[in-house]
Amino acid sequence: MSKKHPIIAVTGSSGAGTSIAKSAFMYIFRKNGINPAIIDGDCFHRYDRNEMDRLSAEAEKKGTRLTHFGPEGNLFDELENVFSEYGKKGSGKRRFYIHDENEASEHNSATGTLTSWEPLQENTDLLFYEGLHGGLVTEKINVAKHVDLLIGVTPIINLEWMQKINRDRAIRGYTTEDATKLILSRMHDYVHYITPQFSLTDINFQRVPTIDTSNPFATHYIPSNDESFSVLHIRNLEKIHVDFHHLLEMLEGSIMSSPDTIVVPAGKKVFAMQLILTPVIQQLLNEK
C-alpha cells in the first residue's frame, strides 16, 4: 500500500461482470478530474491465445493443468512487481491482450495476441487494475498487500457460469460444450486462486438472480437487472465509512440484510458503487 501512489484493484472471474465495475470507476474518475494509470489484468497472461490452446491441450493429455486462473498460465511475479513499483515510484509497465477485432484495430495487432510491453503514463493520480488476480495471495506472491482499495465482483456461481458461456458463444464463437469444458478445466485453479481473494477484499459486489438458474448449462437467457438484486458487502468498515441510512434513502428498493450488507436492485448497482466509492477514492487522494 502507498499513500503517495495508491492502487485500486477490481478482481473477479471470467463472466463475473468486472467490466461493469470498471465503467463505474471510469465515470468517477472523469467526474472528479482524476488521471488514472489503467492496467487490464489479461496483459499478465503468460501465452497468447494460439500458444495457450496448444499448451493446455498438451497439459490435458499429460494430466496436468494450464489455465488462465493459475500460476502456469500467468506472470504472477510480473503483476506483483508492477504493483510494487507503482506504489513506490508511480511508474510501471503494461501491455494488451487482444480479445477481438475492435481491439485488434485499435492496437494494430491480431486477435489473440499480446502486444509489446510499454511504460505506464507519467504523473498519474492512481493505478486502476481490473482483472482476475487483483487480490492474489500464494505461498510466493502477495499482490493484495500492495492494493489500497480492493473490490470483489462475484455473482453467484450459476449466474457467473451463464454469463461466461454466453460471452464465449457471442465473442469467441464457442459452442456451449466448448465453454462448459473450459469451465471444468479451470475448476481447481478457480477454487485455489480466484475465490480466496474475496475474503481479502474491502467490498464485494454479488449479483443474485430472482429467477430459476438451476441449470446454467441448459439456458442462454441471462437474467435482466429487473430479475436480479446486487448484494453489497462492506467487509472493511474501518477503511470504508458508509452512511447506510443515506444509501437506503438514495437507492429505492434497497434493504439492509445485515449490519454491513445492503441489497439493492441490480439496476442501481452502478449508482450504488458511485455513492460508496467516490468518497473513498477522494480520501485516498487527499492522503497523498
Regions found by a protein language model. Give the residues of each.
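Pre-Walker A (Motif I) flank of P-loop NTPase domains
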Residues: S2-I8, T124
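P-loop (Walker A) phosphate-binding loop of NTP-binding proteins
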Residues: G12-S13
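Conserved glycine(s) of the Walker
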Residues: A16-G17
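Hydrophobic positions on the alpha1 helix immediately C-terminal to the Walker A/P-loop
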Residues: I20-A21, F25
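Conserved nucleotide-sensing/catalytic segment adjacent to the nucleotide-binding pocket
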Residues: I34-D40, F44-E103
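C-terminal accessory "lid"/substrate-recognition subdomains
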Residues: T113-E122, V143, I157-K288
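Conserved ATPase-coupling elements of RecA-like P-loop NTPase cores
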Residues: L136-I141
